[in-house]
Amino acid sequence: MTDKIKQQLQKTLLGHVVNDLKVVIITPISSAFKKLKLILECTEIYKNGFFDNTDFKTQNGISGLLVLIPQGVSSQDIMYAFSDTHIIFFGYAGSLCKDITIGTILEIETARLPDGQSISLEVFNSYNSVVCGYSPCLLGEIAFKYCEKAFVEKCHIVDMEICYCAYAAKVNHNKFTAMVVVSDIPNTINFWELCKYNKENFKQASNQALEYIATYIN
């Protein structure tokens, strides 16, 4: 993809063209976007494109961008707007292992795509690293089918966006790191039905993960 096409894609998705970026933080979670905006002391939010986004500078003077991406297959679109950039993903995931409980912070070392392809990710090496499988949802018959397949493939968790983004990042020669907090046990515990204890653990873990990402890039 040429620079001209990338710039046009940036204008469409972000509402502006960005240059000399070293790091891009992406998340499909609106509360995480707001939290990171405060931590990174971002000011203006660009709303002229498809994705809300805001720029920031680290304490070392490195230019970065924070982007609220959509959930689902469209999440990967942002990957095509950059090349040779470190992209850091934060999101939630469903656990397939009984010892990976609600509120566990994890790094993704491998993304297993629906076609069986495996993609290696960059890791921080600060939290446990796991294999992430693909599932388009976490409830119902479709979730059962995909989660069962992921479990057989020795995946520890499932998430849709990580798999799509990992593939697109590889195609565009981006360095991709993903950190998640476990929010669901597919077809057993739903995020919206967490008990008070699990909610508190989950909230604390989410804040800890976001603080870690902000500290890491600084």
Feature roles, as predicted:
Residues 29, 94, 134-137, 164, ...:
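Glycine-rich beta-alpha junction loops
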Residues 1-125, 155-156, 171:
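Metabolite-binding pocket within alpha/beta catalytic cores that recognizes anionic/polar moieties
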Residues 168-198:
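Zn-dependent metallopeptidase/amidohydrolase metal-coordination segment
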Residues 116-172:
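Active-site rim beta-loop-alpha module in soluble metabolic enzymes
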Residues 186-218:
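His/Asp/Glu-rich mid-to-C-terminal helical/loop segments that flank catalytic regions of hydrolases
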Residues 76-80, 163-170, 180, 207-214:
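Predominant activation on well-ordered alpha-helical scaffold segments within soluble catalytic domains
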Residues 31, 73-77, 160-164, 197-208:
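Conserved active-site and cofactor/substrate-binding residues in soluble primary-metabolism enzymes
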